[in-house]
């Protein structure tokens, strides 16, 4: 009996409850998302977008199927993207994009999981320069068969770390670096490629951690560089397309010194094998397989002053001529460009509005507006479902197209009627009209936003709702002019500002 009493609690503590958020048709969330939903699975060619959801603390697995897309974008604040669970997995077969080029502060991408597997396309794009991002993708099982692109618009001192320190990453695809410094802290196995574009640098910081001899470092356009730790037992690293008339540099973390007495030179090139050997202090070195056809007279010892790299005087070598066998190896995929994320814009027009609000015991309500517009730009159509997302009976999510017409006004006349008495009041106000189209069915939402904090717009039941004005056209959680929402489900008041009336046609859906 005593044993059974002990075993049952132990078994109970091992039980876990998991949930999955399945996206089977395109969905966009603006400003907020509940990351407590657990695992996220994007399927059936769907796309899932999180726009201006600044603190993305994922709490489950991520699975992106083939032909699906997951977009996380920040157009204002710094984006904080975190996975901090050594039991979770990330598997991408489609396209995953993190876009922070418009952020006003440095962003963070800190991924610590059990398994990271990419057979699709991943693009992590950052502003860079003085806004140096933190980039870390650590997993005990780290495999890339697709393309992983780490992109900075302007190079910064940011150092990208891939894998667990002292562990192993497996790369059979392409890791693209654009204006990015990456520090090797693991073994690298596989016959894949690391492509260095523009001002990128790769630092082989621990030469005792082997890099597969069939793995390729590709030096692309711009002035990319490679720097390796000099050791007494050198490796041979395969480098493609070295040259670019002196723009490319390969070096060590120590000066390339020649010791005349010992007959040791700081560098040598074997015209029969295509091996370039760099030597520091005459005894410790590294070897680079750059290929055949180079003219030894065109090599020159130089200094690598790349941003983020420890500058070593006379620690590198360049080739003052084009690569004799220039070109991108077939193993190195073309680095994908950074797409432009969806943005929300609005146009302003001058109008005069009149609102009529009637409250009776049955809580019926109506609204009528008239407007005179000036010659301003037409409203912009954006794609989002954060304002009013719909859930279909089978649990999938539908695509929503929203037309937002943001207008301004000087005076609104409000007439509140109850107990056979009506009381007109006036107040400055703003008006936003939202047309939501989902599966060819439209919902029109009109938002009135008084510019005073003390105007009472109406009575719903026995509640008096005192409405203020949200900051900008979009309020908390992405809702336009949140506050009182009246639809087929009745009226509901919130503690925030704005007045919202919905002419709901979704009889069988839920917001």
Curated annotation (Swiss-Prot):
Family: Belongs to the HYR1/IFF family.
Pfam family, one: Hyphal_reg_CWP
Cellular component terms per the entry's GO annotation: cell surface; extracellular region; fungal-type cell wall
Positions of glycan attachment: 245
Source species taxonomy: Eukaryota, Fungi, Dikarya, Ascomycota, Saccharomycotina
Keyword Protease: no
Mutant phenotype after disruption: Leads to hypersensitivity to cell wall-damaging agents and highly attenuated in a murine model of systemic infection.
Signal peptide: 1-19
Compositionally biased region (Low complexity): 349-392
Additional observations: IFF11 differs from other HYR1/IFF family members in lacking a GPI-anchor.
Residue runs in coiled coils: none
Superkingdom per UniProt: Eukaryota
Induction: Repressed by HAP43.
Record's keyword terms, sorted: Cell wall, Glycoprotein, Secreted, Signal, Virulence
Stated name of the protein: Cell wall protein IFF11
PTM comment: O-glycosylated.
Subcellular location: Secreted, Cell wall
Keyword DNA-binding: no
Function: GPI-anchored cell wall protein involved in cell wall organization, hyphal growth, as well as in host-fungal interaction and virulence.
Record region (Disordered): 349-397
